[in-house]
From Swiss-Prot:
Together with proteins McbE and McbF this protein causes immunity to the peptide antibiotic microcin B17 (MccB17), which inhibits DNA replication in Enterobacteriaceae by induction of the SOS repair system. McbG alone can provide some protection. InterPro entries: 5peptide_repeat (IPR001646), Pentapeptide-BTB/POZ_domain (IPR051082). Pfam families: Pentapeptide. This is Protein McbG. It comes from Escherichia coli. It comes from the Bacteria. Keywords: Antibiotic resistance, Plasmid. SUPFAM superfamilies: Pentapeptide repeat-like. The lineage of its organism: Bacteria, Pseudomonadati, Pseudomonadota, Gammaproteobacteria, Enterobacterales.
Length: 187
């Protein structure tokens, strides 16, 4: 079933499953999804605004050119999203979200708050994290080349297990990287 150019607002769905539905150019506002299962679904060019999305199960799920603004994403394993996967997150809270083995080049994560998140074996080249906060969030074996981490807080990147060619980082994060490398900056 295809759903095109619909505005869906103020819904609370929990402990349910949606199968075989494709959304195109839809807007979701103030939607709450808890313990929801998406099977063989696709969202393309959709916007999610002020939504709460917790503990999703994703099977044969596609997310293409979607935007999340002012949303809470919690307990989501983004590794279950099929390729291609393109999205932007603006002013979102992410808790216990795993980005594993994904190709997310040129993704946008502006002014987001990451808590207990993991980026592992993920290609994030040329992604923009400007203004984001990181709390207990790890990057492991990921390509961060040409990423912009300007004005971020709490960023801690291990250069021994990540590719960090030409990245923009705040001074605090740069000092942490130098310390890991055994370089002491004094003055």
């Amino acid at each position: 079933m295809d759903i095109i150019e619909k505005r869906i607002t103020k819904r609370h769905l929990s402990e349910s499953e949606l199968s075989g539905v494709n959304y195109y150019n839809c807007i979701f506002e103030r939607i709450q999804l808890d313990n929801f299962n998406f099977r063989d679904c696709e969202f393309e060019k959709c916007r999610f605004v002020n939504c709460s999305i917790k503990n999703l199960k994703l099977n044969f799920f596609k997310l293409i050119d979607c935007e999340f603004k002012d949303c809470l994403l919690q307990g989501v394993n983004a590794a279950d999203i099929m390729f291609p996967c393109t999205f932007s997150l603006v002013n979102c809270d992410l808790r216990f979200v795993d980005f594993i083995s994904l190709r997310l080049q040129k993704s946008i994560f502006l002014s987001c708050r990451f808590r207990d998140c993991l980026f592992e074996e993920t290609d994030l080249r040329k992604s923009d994290f400007t203004g984001s906060e990181f709390n207990n969030t790890e990057f492991r074996h990921s390509d961060l080349s040409h990423c912009d981490f300007s004005m971020t807080e709490g960023l801690d990147i291990n250069p021994e297990i990540n590719r960090i060619l030409s990245i923009k980082i705040p001074q605090e994060a740069g000092l942490k990287i130098l310390k890991r490398m055994g370089v002491v900056v004094g003055g």
